[in-house]
Amino acid sequence: MNHGFLPISRKEMEERGWNQVDFVYVSGDAYVDHPSFGHAIITRLLEAHGFRVGIIAQPDWKDKESITEFGEPRLGFMVSAGNMDSMVNHYSVSKKRRQQDSYTPGGVMGKRPDYAAVVYGNLIRQTYKKTPIILGGIEASLRRLAHYDYWSNQLKRSILLDSGADLVSYGMGERSIIEIAEALDAGLDIKDITYIDGTVCKVKNLDSVYDAEILEPYEEMKKDKLLYAKSFYRQYCNTDPFSGKRLVEPYSDHLYVVQNPPAKPLTQQEMDDVYALPYMRTYHPSYETAGGVPAIREIKFSLISNRGCFGGCSFCALTFHQGRIIQTRSKESLIAEAKTFPEDPEFKGYIHDVGGPTANFRAPACKKQLKYGACTNKQCLFPKPCKNLIADHKEYLSILRDLRKIPGVKKVFIRSGIRFDYLLADPDDTFFKELCQYHVSGQLKVAPEHVADPVLQMMGKPENAVYERFTHKYEEINKRLGLKQYLVPYLMSSHPGSTMKEAVKLAEYLRDLGYMPEQVQDFYPTPSTISTCMYYTGVDPRTMKPVYVPKNPHEKAMQRALIQYRNPKNYDLVMEALRIADRMDLVGFDEKCLIRPRKLHSEKMQEKNGYSGRNHGGTHGGTDRKSKNPNGNSKNPGKTNGNYKNPNAGHKNTKPASTGNGRGESSSRPQKKKSIRNVHKRK
């Protein structure tokens, strides 16, 4: 019997003396009773309000009996695909099946279906025809209205219509789920619960729907992508809990999907209360024989300090899910949780993270947001920081200092990600200094994403000059501290707006940096982001202007290969990309070249027999070491590899790439293999 955990079987329910639960929570993730998991927060919150909850984690979707473990619940079913969209969880951007599921015991893949929320909803409806079904979690939240689905390459209907569910609780859900539970407990029919903020419902007519904005009809959007772009941007402009309007999406047969305004953000006291619930902070013991749940490793000794993000990245869905208004826990709440870590025998003295979507956002962007909401017509940081932005790290710094003082804590890391433009906007460098001194272990990961300003513009990221300022300041601070620490940039290929020209520019940047990433993130069109809308429609929904979109798999492979141009396996792709970009000047023996030209078969045979045309002044294949013109009969025969600016221009503190064999190795002497520590290293 595990009284510490909520029941996961009829036996455990009966051991509690219950003959029925109020709600059955069906989850695509294994049961992990930790506040990093949405199912843990919602079920514990319901428990705190007096409701009896049973959990069915990862039911067998091929067997409808798998969701009858507790029988019919008194009030309803709650369904979530898990902490991730099930399709992102299952497939890479190239649509290849992933090998591991970190949210499943033993990391085993295949324990949940594709489109899990839809499958679970219909599975329940087969047996329980009239029992209320409420969808929640990120999959339902980001698919609550018509949305582009990358995996099927089509515009899909609201998840509410395909799942057999009655309501969607979108966003973080604490406020709406308690209101729904109390309404059902009071005897209201689920069809009459159409008024709760943070929910989406379906109706047959609009007689009881007031102050609503009518979106483009689904059937028309399927025929015209530009109509979808307009609808999406209207949705985007109504994600604020203070200014957001009620939205109505018409469907055929006089059916309407109604999105109520977002729920109001939690107060700090409410946030503290949520994270003070009696979590077991680990996975259910029944998973022990399978090796546990891998996802717990990184989050077990991490602290969630905030929610929301006003960064405004185009490829991120946080605006649709958590909103732009920052919600935080108090210092006292964070310290109290951290003091429990040393009591765990698995704790080694390291707090893995103190953050959230963005670690260094600890307050709303400006004073007006908690009263009037975030601006609908402009961003807080993009393209430049707003004049009303309050960039202040004092409170966050105070929290980190107190965490370092806790007995048994050796090191406090920050791994959520630092928003470097916000950091630079703070006139006080104290946090920056202490970040380098105490919270970085050799390398700091940051996300410039790209270096070409046209691509950064589409991404909603600051121009590259801002990142350059950050790198120089980071180096200066570490030098003053006597530390050798480096930056590891996260970079993205094939984002809308990235032509082959911009992709080559990114490769040149990495060449000057002397760094080749081990992994490359190709743009992934996930539901409900501005970038995904660009990918599907070919226009920027903010301006309705056309955007170049790299969609062809081969072109995407070339852009990805350019980031790892030193990898011999990528040679042909890089060569093809350089031809397309009209940059054959980057093929040769100069230190600025990305790859060397390949020898012709006749030249290889001569060298094999002891004759080297190059050693005798020949120019086999149009390559002359003296003239350094590898282009032969290319489009730019007169362009040589010697015509370059200072190779370290703009990167005086970074190590330039070595020259040679296409992998960055010297042709005259062996070079030390590049490692992650070469990033932003001084000469």
What are these regions (language model features)?
Residues 26-29, 290-317, 342, 350:
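N-terminal pre-triad scaffold of radical SAM enzymes
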Residues 604-605, 609-683:
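Intrinsically disordered, Lys/Arg-rich low-complexity segments
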Residues 166, 274, 309, 334, ...:
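Conserved, mostly hydrophobic/aromatic
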Residues 62, 191-242, 263-266, 293, ...:
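Terminal amphipathic helices with adjacent charged low-complexity linkers/tails
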Residues 18, 25, 56, 60-61, ...:
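Conserved SAM/AdoMet-binding glycine-rich loop
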Residues 159-171, 561-605:
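Amphipathic alpha-helical packing elements
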Residues 85-94, 142-144, 174-179, 204-207, ...:
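Flexible glycine/acidic-rich beta-alpha junction loops that bind and position SAM and/or redox cofactors
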Residues 38, 57-252, 259:
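Glycine-rich beta-alpha loop elements in corrinoid/cobalamin-binding modules
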